[in-house]
């Protein structure tokens, strides 16, 4: 429900500025959380039966065709970021750390997604729905990629196979 009526220019400016602030604010808060606080066995992160050991992501979403094109924001964070584009190692410790980082990244994108309904407060209804669509289009592929990678890494660790 629209509570604030602004001229179109200011509404668009507010939309762009607020999305930037939300993205950066959530990311900067999330990188402050120690990695040990994330548990891949937690209800949010653990593999669900419907994911079919990650096969759902390839069978339905064809993740292998587009995952490599996703942006990696880690380089923007300097030492606080964990680069996910190029695998830096294949040993067990690195894969476990990478799994924890997939939890952080997934939660980051879920939190960003939760902000989308706020845009109904100053946008028309159709633009509010457009903001929800934008948030879903921006964040859901990144969430899917984190879940897919975590399932894959868990399988590699379980099988004792360091091959990607």
Which ranges hold each PLM region?
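Short, strongly hydrophobic alpha-helical membrane anchors
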Residues: 1-7
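Residue-level signature of transmembrane alpha-helical entry/exit and packing/kink sites
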Residues: 7, 11-19, 97, 127, ...
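N-terminal signal-anchor transmembrane alpha helix
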Residues: 10-51
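Hydrophobic, lipid-facing residues on alpha-helical transmembrane segments of integral membrane proteins
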Residues: 13, 17, 21, 25, ...
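Membrane-proximal soluble regions of multi-pass membrane proteins
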Residues: 35-98, 155, 159-164
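Transmembrane alpha-helical segments and their cytosolic interface motifs
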Residues: 94-127
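Hydrophobic core segments of alpha-helical transmembrane domains in multi-pass membrane proteins
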Residues: 119, 127-138
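Juxtamembrane membrane-interface segments at transmembrane alpha-helix termini
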Residues: 140-152
